[in-house]
Design a protein with these regions (language model features):
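ATP-binding glycine-rich loop module of kinase domains
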Residues: 13-53
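Conserved short submotifs of the Hanks-type protein kinase catalytic core
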Residues: 73-87, 91
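Conserved HxN/HPN-centered segment at the entrance to the catalytic loop
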Residues: 59-68
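Catalytic-loop of the protein kinase fold
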Residues: 117-133
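Activation segment signature within eukaryotic-like protein kinase domains
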Residues: 105-106
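Conserved HRD-motif arginine in the catalytic loop of eukaryotic-like protein kinases
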Residues: 223
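Conserved activation segment of eukaryotic-like protein kinases, specifically the C-terminal portion
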Residues: 157-170
């Protein structure tokens, strides 16, 4: 796909509505089709686009839809679904989740991750800011900029990616990230939704305590080994 043609077509068919994020590594804009009035997100980031290209052919109700991917010389442009709703982070600004609400969100994320992990995709950045709840109450996992494909022949990750507090120890060069890396983040997420704090500061003391503790074990071998196992415990 020609870069000039791609950008010219976008400019001709879409108008800029708002900018959601803009820094040296990532720009995220909301565009609106000039004729149809439909909104979509244009994401520009420094990366290969390898995972987004796989997502383009993957449809799941709990994963943001990816429409098109263009790879430039040192960046990737992703056109994806615009989700009208709130992030879990925005919901937490108004109050904590009840146990059932937190379980429902994690169940939905496990459904999404089961499909992703089957394809070898590890998200590596599950956190409240990357989980949307749309107007119909549907949970959507977004932002795959830090995601990677699991490669069995590798001993560690090529690049250190993720968010401090939610990233598992192996994301910092100790081993290769795998499905258990995302399970670690789910444990932290549950604790934050229920207490407002990282488990190292305030560990949830209710019925989900043992589940959270198992998710966030430093040793991946002591965590749940799959999201299916986690769902069964929930």
């Amino acid at each position: 796909m020609d870069e000039g043609w791609f950008n010219a077509t976008l400019d001709e068919q879409y108008e800029l509505i708002k900018t959601l994020k803009s820094n040296d590594d990532t720009q995220i804009h909301v565009l609106r089709h000039r004729t149809l009035g439909r909104d979509m997100v244009k994401r520009v980031y420094k990366g290969t686009g390898e995972v987004y290209k796989l997502l383009r052919s993957l449809a799941h109700p709990n994963i943001v839809n990816v429409y098109e991917v263009f790879t430039g010389s040192d960046y990737t442009v992703v056109l994806e679904e615009y989700i009208n709703g709130q992030t879990v982070a925005e919901v937490l600004e108004t109050g904590l989740y009840h146990t059932r609400g937190a379980i429902n969100i994690v169940h939905a994320l496990c459904d999404a991750l089961e499909i992703l992990h089957t394809k070898g995709i590890i998200h590596r950045d599950i956190k409240p800011e990357n989980i949307m709840i749309d107007e119909a109450g549907m949970v959507k996992l977004i932002d795959f900029d830090a995601a990677k494909l699991y490669k069995s022949y590798k001993s560690d990750d090529t690049r250190i990616m993720g968010t401090a507090g939610y990233a598992a120890p192996e994301q910092f060069g100790l081993a290769q990230s795998d499905e258990r890396t995302d399970i670690f983040a789910l444990g932290v997420l549950m604790n934050v939704m229920l207490t407002g704090s990282h488990p190292s500061k305030k560990l949830y003391s209710g019925k989900l305590k043992s589940i959270i503790e198992k998710c966030i074990q430093t040793n991946p071998g002591k965590r749940y080994q799959s999201v299916t196992q986690l769902q069964e415990s929930l």
